[in-house]
Amino acid sequence: MITDYCPTPPTAKKLKIIYGWYIYTIYAQLVFNIYLAVYNGCVRRPIEAPLISVCHSIFIAFLLYQVVKKRTRFAWVMLAYYILMRLYYANVLHIEFNAWSRGLVFIFLTLLLAGTVAVGQLATPPLRQDWLARLGWRQWATLAALSGLLTPLITADYLS
């Protein structure tokens, strides 16, 4: 009988630390969107912008609630939402991303990728311990390289 390749799983402590930082990342996005809703409501007069920010905040709060319950699909939805919102900010709102903001996008994207992997391993039961789920330095380098590749792609303005 041939057994599947099963690398050593990450320790529970490492998974909980990554999961904690993942939750903090989502909280930071939620607080930022609430700030935008208040800012848009106080400074801008049109009703659309504050309502859009409030809807984004409610959606992120819903995703956070589902991720705290360790539902893997919602972690992937959160990652896709983050990428789509960066494309929206860059292409529809024509927001310029400088080096500092691209660095922040890189850090958030790396934490969201690692958190998505950690949520998959903390879910009951984790079906398979794949190479990426070991979360050693090689896996972190892979996630950072993927984030480094995606960051300029999702922060570039293609429509102007």
Question: Language model features by range: what are they?
Answer:
Residues 1-160:
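Topology signature of small-to-medium multi-pass alpha-helical membrane proteins
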